[in-house]
Regions:
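Sec/Tat signal peptide C-region and signal peptidase I cleavage site
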Residues: 16-20
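C-terminal tail/sorting-segment detector
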Residues: 2-3, 490, 494, 498, ...
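Glycine-centered coil/turn sites that cap beta-strands in beta-rich domains
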Residues: 439-456, 460-480, 501-508, 521-524
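Extracellular beta-rich repeat passengers
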Residues: 21-56, 66-80, 85-86, 90-192, ...
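Sec-dependent N-terminal signal peptides
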Residues: 4-14
Length: 534
C-alpha cells in the first residue's frame, strides 16, 4: 500500500496523515498475487494473469479501470482468478471516474472489462481461437477446466471500444470449463455486450445485466453450459448501432454445424426490455428479446421476455430444424409487451414451421401488455423490483428444473424470481461515488494500554472517528462487521508502533443499521457497536 506520511510536531502531540492511494496493476502477473480490501487498485493497460499464477481478490476490494490505457483484466488459460466476494462485501470493478470527487462522470466503456480464458472445447477449426479485443488465444480439450471463482462481483462501466466495432464486453468467457465457479455477478453500463461466452462449458447462476449497450447475454463458438437465475434490464435510450437484443446466439459467425454446437441450457430468466408501455419512446436500434440464429440450439425454460419490439426470432434453416426436432426449445415461458410481433422466423428453408403452434405446444403464453405479467416494478431504472405480485401468471405454468446438482429444482416459477429477491444487498443499480481512502492520524506515542474508544459521532452519517491505542508495537487489525458478522470494511490491517491513533471512517457506501467495529492488537481483542443512520 502506497502512503504519504507527514509529521507535524505541536506541543507534545504529533500527527501522521495516511491516505490510501491506488496500487497500479500493469503488464503480466506471473506469480500468485493477492489484492486486499484495505487497498484500492488501478488496472493500467492489459493486465494478464499468466499460467500457473493465481490472482486472489479479497471480499470488498475495489479495482478501478483506467480509460486512457484501456485497463483490462485477462485471465489466461491455465491461470486462475479467485474472486470470492460476499453478499455484504462484494468485489467491485469499476471506472476510475466512479471515485468520489472525480471531475468526470462515469459512463459506458470507461475501461475494458474482465476476460477469462480457458482450455475447454470451442468449435473453430483447430479447437483454438483468438479472443475478440486483445486477441489472446484460448480453447482446448478439457471441458472440466477450472479458471477459478467469481462470486459476488460487480463490473461497472466496462466495454471500451478498442477500434471501430471492436469492443471488450463486460465479462467475456472464452473456452472456460465447468470446473470454474461463476455466480452473483452484476454487469452495469457495459459499452458492448454485458456477458459473452465463446465456447466452453462453464455453468453460471445469479447474473444481472443492467443498462447494457449491445446484447445482454451473447453465446457463440459452441458454448454448452448451464445457466439459472438471470435478469436483464435495459435503458430505453441506449442501443448499439449493430442493433441490441437480449439474447443473441450463434453457433459461429457463418452458421456452420461445427461441433461442439452452441447449446446452452437456460432456466429461470427475466428479460426486461426498453419499452415499459405502448407510449414509451425507445431507441430504434432495439430489436428482439431473443435472437436465436446461425445453427444455435438453445434450450430455454421458465423465462419471461417483456418490453421488446419483437419477443423471439428464430433465424436460419438449421435453427428452425432444431426447433422442429426438439434439440432447440423454449418451454413454459412468457412473452409480453411486444410492439411489433411476439415472435417470428427468418429463412426457414424447406422446413414447414408454424411458430405459433410450436409456442403453444411448448406451454408458451403471450400477453399484450407488460402489466398483465404483474411483476412489482421491473422497469424502474434505479430501484427495480422484479418479484411477481400475488396475481402474476409467472407463479403458475412453470416446469420443474432438473435436480442434477447444479439447477435449483425448487424454482417452480416463470422468470428469475419467486418470493426471494436475490439481488438484494450486494447489487447496486446506482453505482459510483466510491470513497477510496481512509485517513488515519497518530495522536500520541505514549499510550498506557491497549484501548478502543467509542466512535464519535454516534449515530453518524456518513463519517465517524474511531480512536484506538496500542501499548506496544503490534500487528493491528481494525474491521467493521455487520450484525451477521460479515466484514464490510477493513480500516487497518498493518503493523503499528506504540501510539494512539484516530481513524476517520466514511460509510457512504453502506446502508443504515447497526455495525460492530473490532480491534485486534497483540493478544487483545475489543469490540464496540456503532449506528449508521442515513
Amino acid at each position: 500500500m502506497k502512503k504519504m506520511f507527514s509529521v507535524i510536531l505541536f506541543l507534545s502531540l504529533f500527527a501522521i496523515n495516511v491516505f490510501a492511494q491506488d496500487i497500479v496493476l500493469s503488464g503480466d502477473i506471473t506469480s500468485n498475487t493477492t489484492l486486499t480490501a484495505n487497498n484500492t487498485y488501478l488496472l493500467n493497460g492489459y493486465v494478464r494473469v499468466q499460467a500457473p499464477a493465481v490472482l486472489t481478490i479479497e471480499a470488498g476490494t475495489k479495482i478501478f479501470g483506467d480509460k486512457s490505457s484501456l485497463g483490462t483484466l485477462i485471465i489466461k488459460p491455465g491461470a486462475k482468478i479467485m474472486a470470492a466476494g460476499t453478499e455484504a462485501n462484494p468485489i467491485i470493478f469499476t471506472s476510475v471516474f466512479a471515485k468520489s470527487g472525480s471531475v468526470s462522470t462515469p459512463s459506458y466503456g470507461d475501461w475494458g472489462g474482465i476476460i477469462i480464458l480457458g482450455n475447454a472445447k470451442i468449435n473453430p477449426a483447430g479447437g483454438t481461437a483468438a479472443i475478440e479485443g486483445p486477441g489472446d488465444s484460448f480453447g482446448g480439450t478439457d471441458d472440466e477446466d477450472n479458471s477459478g471463482v467469481m462470486q459476488y462481483v460487480r463490473i461497472e462501466y466496462p466495454g471500451i471500444a478498442l477500434t471501430l466495432n471492436n469492443e471488450i464486453n463486460g465479462l467475456t468467457m472464452g473456452g472456460v470449463g465447468r470446473g470454474t465457479t461463476i455466480d452473483h455477478i452484476q454487469v452495469s453500463y457495459s459499452g458492448d455486450d454485458s456477458y459473452e461466452w465463446f465456447g466452453g462449458t462453464v455453468n453460471c447462476k445469479y447474473l444481472i445485466a443492467f443498462r447494457g449497450w449491445d446484447d445482454d447475454f451473447d453465446t457463440d463458438f459452441g458454448y454448452s453450459g448451464k445457466l439459472q437465475y438471470l435478469v436483464a434490464l435495459r435503458d430505453p435510450d441506449i442501443a448499439d448501432q449493430s442493433s441490441s437484443n437480449g439474447f443473441e446466439s450463434d453457433n459461429d459467425g457463418s452458421g456452420t454445424l461445427n461441433e461442439p454446437i452452441t447449446s446452452p441450457t437456460w432456466w429461470n430468466v427475466t428479460m426486461i426490455g426498453p419499452k415499459k408501455e405502448s407510449g414509451t419512446t425507445i431507441n430504434s436500434l432495439y430489436k428482439r428479446g431473443m435472437h436465436l440464429r446461425r445453427s444455435s440450439r438453445n434450450k430455454i425454460s421458465n423465462t419471461i421476455i417483456m418490453g421488446w419490439p419483437t419477443g423471439i426470432r428464430l433465424d436460419g434453416a438449421n435453427t428452425i430444424q432444431a426447433a422442429l426436432n426438439g434439440t432447440m426449445y423454449i418451454n413454459n415461458s412468457i412473452v409480453a409487451g411486444y410492439t411489433s410481433t411476439a415472435m417470428d422466423t427468418v429463412s426457414a428453408g424447406g422446413a414447414s414451421f408454424n411458430m405459433g403452434d410450436w409456442w403453444t405446444a411448448s406451454s408458451g403464453r403471450t400477453f399484450t401488455a407488460n402489466t398483465e405479467v404483474a411483476l412489482t416494478d421491473p422497469f424502474n431504472l434505479t430501484t427495480p423490483n422484479f418479484l411477481p405480485t400475488s396475481s402474476s401468471p409467472a407463479l403458475t405454468g412453470a416446469a420443474t428444473p432438473p435436480s442434477d446438482g447444479f439447477f435449483d429444482a425448487t424454482a417452480n416459477f416463470v422468470g428469475a424470481f419467486g418470493s426471494v429477491d436475490w439481488t438484494a444487498v450486494w447489487a447496486d443499480f446506482t453505482p459510483g461515488n466510491y470513497v477510496t481512502s481512509v485517513e488515519e492520524n497518530q495522536l500520541s506515542s505514549t499510550p498506557v494500554d491497549f484501548n478502543l474508544s467509542q466512535n464519535y459521532p454516534n449515530p453518524f452519517n456518513p463519517s465517524t472517528k474511531i480512536v484506538y491505542s496500542v501499548a506496544q508495537p503490534s500487528q493491528v487489525k481494525l474491521v467493521v462487521t455487520n450484525i451477521l458478522g460479515q466484514v464490510v470494511e477493513t480500516l487497518v490491517d498493518e503493523f503499528r508502533s506504540a501510539g494512539t491513533f484516530e481513524v476517520n471512517f466514511n460509510a457512504e457506501n453502506l446502508s443504515s443499521g447497526l455495525y460492530i467495529y473490532s480491534l485486534e492488537a497483540g493478544s487483545v481483542s475489543i469490540s464496540k457497536k456503532m449506528t449508521l443512520l442515513k
